[in-house]
Amino acid sequence: MPGNLEPLDLGIQIPYHFRCPISLDLMSDPVTISTGQTYDRTSIDSWIAMGNTTCPVTRVALSDFTLIPNHTLRRLIQEWCVANRSNGVERIPTPKQPADPISVRSLLSQASAITGTHVSVRSRAAAIRRLRGLARDSEKNRVLIAGHNAREILVRILFADIETTSLSSELVSESLALLVLLHMTETECEAVASDPSRVGFMTRLLFDSSIEIRVNAAALIEMVLTGAKSMDLKLIISGSDSIFEGVLDLLKNPISSRRALKIGIKAIFALCLVKQTRHLAISAGAPGILIDRLAADFDRCDTERGLATVELLCRLPEGCAAFGEHALTVPLMVKTILRVSDRATEYAAGALLALCTAEERCRDEAAAAGLVTQLLLLVQSDCTERAKRKAQMLLKLLRDSWPDDSTVHSDDFNRSEVAPF
């Protein structure tokens, strides 16, 4: 953290009153409690969250738990940081203040008001936009907003007049954007999933002209799918007409943002966890889109989800056929082994096992791509036991595809610890 322990390491003496009495670190967000003592907000928040009801320094009982920002001290600390910049001290940023409960209640009241002569759609949307700004600032703000019945209000606004609401409505856009920042409960997710009209509306939002609405719609679908525990309700969502096409469009769009890609792969993975509708993903073109994206620009977590989705779809014969037709599938799966993470290796090995079991051509491609060497390294690595089992099964499948001068005939293989076939 800027201005935390680094100045001490440089031999610079931090003024006593700039240190938090709890952590002894330079304060970045000083606040004063009812006893008049000042602490760093993070430290005193943790102290109170642990159930303590006294001042850490004076041991006097707190008359209330209000934290008052000490702007004067914070500015003095910032000036000190600037004065010591040449010594490697970075200026602490001006912290954003936590949401005020009274303001949150007022904004939610304005957002939920009935549109009429005194309250316009624009003013309601503006109230939700301000709440969204607060929610983006911190998890504490999100908890505060959710604690004032915000999710129920937002769901009611979002799904009001489903048949007549304009999909590009500012009110729909803002309420959707805020809702996906809050954590819906299992009951709330199942209430949405159990209503076919609401599921249909979420699916229609995937085809809106606004990319932000489409991305947030996919985020809401993923949230509801993950939150609802009933498989029957998950099936209602994954079976919604064109839902796979809408989510996959986020992945194949060449101008997709990093957030769109991340939410898109999370949503398609959640949809493909529903076994009964995986064939819809295949018919919607998921195999080609997934391989193209995996070969291009996923980060590690997204790569893991993408590979997990590939393995799920390879459990269907039509999935194996579709992936097998893509020229990059087998080489990409082989390349992934031991390159990304243990999970990625396990999923890639699982997909290759399904592909090589289904088609001799895939076995030949895998052997030509150097899979044998990768598998021999894998079974002797610290990877997961599941990955090693898949590797050994693949080795058995591939032995007939190994050329005469391959690893199988080398001294290295004879000395390896691979279990005999």
From Swiss-Prot:
InterPro entries: ARM-like, ARM-type_fold, PUB22/23/24-like, RING-Ubox_PUB, Ubox_domain, Znf_RING/FYVE/PHD. Gene3D superfamilies: Leucine-rich Repeat Variant, Zinc/RING finger domain, C3HC4 (zinc finger). GO terms for biological process: defense response to other organism; protein ubiquitination. Keywords: Transferase, Ubl conjugation pathway. The keyword Coiled coil does not apply. PROSITE patterns: U_BOX. The keyword Glycosyltransferase does not apply. Its EC number is 2.3.2.27. One of its GO terms (molecular function) is ubiquitin protein ligase activity. Residues 13-87 form the U-box domain. It catalyses: S-ubiquitinyl-[E2 ubiquitin-conjugating enzyme]-L-cysteine + [acceptor protein]-L-lysine = [E2 ubiquitin-conjugating enzyme]-L-cysteine + N(6)-ubiquitinyl-[acceptor protein]-L-lysine. It comes from the Eukaryota. It is an enzyme of class 2 (transferase). CDD domains: RING-Ubox_PUB. Pathway: Protein modification; protein ubiquitination. Functions as an E3 ubiquitin ligase. This is U-box domain-containing protein 26. It comes from Arabidopsis thaliana.
